[in-house]
Design a protein with these regions (language model features):
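Catalytic-site neighborhoods of secreted/periplasmic enzymes
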Residues: 77-179, 183-206, 375, 380-382
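Short, solvent-exposed turn/loop segments enriched in Gly/Ser/Thr/Pro and often Arg
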Residues: 40-45, 58-82, 121-131, 182-187, ...
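C-terminal cap/loop subdomain of S1 sulfatases and analogous C-terminal strand-loop tails that border
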Residues: 172, 291-297, 339-342, 347-394
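Active-site-proximal cap/lid insertion segments
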Residues: 32-45, 171-175, 183-335, 348-355
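Loop/turn elements at helix/coil->beta-strand transitions in domains of secreted/extracellular proteins
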Residues: 21-26, 57-62, 115-119, 173-181, ...
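Hydrophobic h-region of N-terminal signal peptides that target proteins for export
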Residues: 9-18
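Sec-dependent signal peptide recognition
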Residues: 2-9
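Active-site-proximal N-terminal segment of extracellular/periplasmic enzymes that hydrolyze or transfer
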Residues: 20-59
Length: 394
């Protein structure tokens, strides 16, 4: 069933009336969410209906690539608007291996909070100080059981994140706000791999299993880069899946779709809360991910060094006042959410962007204007997952 958010339509047709009012921003981020499961990008599994509804009223960037296919480096880069080699947050390890973002580095939160915005963050952090400027509320895990799939703290924390974001957006402040609802799922897929290590015969769902992707098989293993050849030795989840049969990979896809549907319901609740008050009319919504997931392509699960599109090509969606609805995804423009989110939101809010930030503002494209400044290429980096293993190759 298609959901219509009542104030969204009003927002899109009331740009002139809102022109002098600073827009609010709601950023919804889902860990591991790849384009390969989002309906707005042509997928037909029906896993992301609330996200698809937002996308249908705004702008969808197809060629959006993250700066690192790993959570902490990607997030530290995203909220600071710099690449991992610039932040020196290059793995998922904590201090002293990875330094915190220095206090003198402008972040998305500091720029907005210093310019009259209330900046709030709910949910997953994993940021090494890059969320400075945001008021963070730690989510309370709410355990529950699932009859078909294993659930862990990722899913439990998302319940608390959803409740916190809904409570805030149902009673928003009078001043302009920038709010982040930062969900863990579909990250619970990592726990699914651990719970199903090796060949297993149980079926997590009844009925027909999802088909394997067209690029499931690795046809020329000896000629692919060494880091990818040895990924089963350097990545725990790939080791756990290394002896799976084809049906086991179909189980994996079914589980990934399940966790995506779980978080989509929570996204729906957050959006309904936003549009339940007049503030929703003046709020730009951004939907994105810190990185993607292998989705059984090239026999890969979760994320790691490979840089395949499944891991690095993420949803990047904007909708709201001042955003000109486009009938088709923007395919001609290369974007780096890691770098481009900060200058784009600052531009839309009328906030000056520090000159040292390497990203570009996508505001012209969002407004239906000519995009003069573009990326000639995109960059994604890899160092190590936890610095325990040196990955071979470049």
């Amino acid at each position: 069933m298609k959901t219509i958010y009542p104030f969204m339509g009003l927002a899109l047709c009331s740009v002139t009336a809102q022109a002098q009012e600073k827009p609010n921003f709601l950023i919804i981020q889902c860990d591991h969410l790849t384009q390969r499961v989002v309906g707005a990008y042509g997928q037909t599994q029906g896993c992301t209906l609330p996200i698809d509804e937002v996308a249908s009223r705004g702008v969808i960037f197809s060629n959006a690539y993250v700066g690192c296919p790993l959570s902490q480096p990607s997030r530290a880069a995203l909220w600071s608007g710099m690449m991992p080699h610039q932040t020196n947050v290059r793995s998922n390890s904590s201090e002293p291996i990875n330094p915190r973002i220095p206090e003198n580095v402008p972040t998305l939160g500091s720029l907005f909070s210093e310019n009259g915005y209330e900046a709030v963050h709910f949910g997953k952090t994993h940021d090494m100080g890059s969320l400075r400027g945001f008021k963070h509320k730690e989510p309370v895990a709410k355990p529950f059981t699932d009859p078909e799939f294993p659930v862990n703290n990722d899913s439990f924390l998302d319940v608390g994140t959803c409740e916190d974001a809904v409570a805030y957006l149902s009673n928003p402040p009078k001043e302009p706000f920038i709010c982040i609802a930062d969900f863990q799922n579909p990250h619970n897929i990592c726990g699914f791999v651990g719970a199903n290590e090796g060949v297993h015969t149980d079926r997590p769902i009844s009925g027909t299993l999802p088909e394997l992707p067209a690029n499931f098989d690795v046809e020329d293993w000896n000629n692919i880069p060494k880091p990818v050849q040895y990924i089963c030795c350097s990545h725990r989840r790939m080791t756990q899946a290394s002896h799976w049969n084809e049906e086991n990979y179909s189980h994996y896809i079914a589980a990934f779709q399940h966790y995506t549907k779980m978080v989509s319901k929570q996204v729906d609740s957050v959006l309904k809360a936003l549009y339940s008050t007049p503030a929703g009319r003046n709020t730009i919504v951004v939907i994105m991910a810190d990185h993607g997931d292998g989705m059984a392509s090239h026999r890969m699960v979760t994320k790691h060094i490979s840089f395949y599109d499944e891991m690095t090509n993420v949803p990047f969606i904007f909708a709201g006042p001042g955003i000109k609805q486009q009938k088709k995804p923007v395919k001609q423009l290369l974007t780096q959410p890691t770098l481009d989110l900060l200058p784009t939101l600052c531009d839309l809010a009328g906030i000056s962007v520090p000159v040292e930030k390497p990203g570009i503002s996508l505001a012209p494209t969002l407004k239906g204007e000519k995009q003069k400044k573009t990326h000639p290429y995109v960059v994604s980096e890899w160092h190590s997952e936890y610095e325990y293993v040196v990955t071979p190759g470049r």
